Amino acid sequence: SGSEVAKIGDGCFGLPLDRIGSASGMGCRSVPKPTPGGS
């Protein structure tokens, strides 16, 4: 499911990935795919 979350980018924080983003602070940037969506 991580792949799907990375694609959304915006959902990175809304989805379970938030746990990694909150701890690392860059869960969305962790994957090169969300680069265009994160911007």
From Swiss-Prot:
Residues 1-8 form a propeptide. One of its GO terms (cellular component) is extracellular region. Belongs to the natriuretic peptide family. Disulfide bonds join 12-28. InterPro entries: Natr_peptide, Natr_peptide_CS. Snake venom natriuretic peptide that targets both NPR1 and NPR2. Exhibits hypotensive and vasodepressor activities. Keywords: Disulfide bond, Hypotensive agent, Secreted, Toxin, Vasoactive, Vasodilator. The keyword Iron-sulfur does not apply. Expressed by the venom gland. Transmembrane segments: none annotated. Pfam families: ANP. One of its GO terms (biological process) is regulation of blood pressure. It is found in: Secreted. This is Natriuretic peptide NsNP-a. GO terms for molecular function: hormone activity; toxin activity.
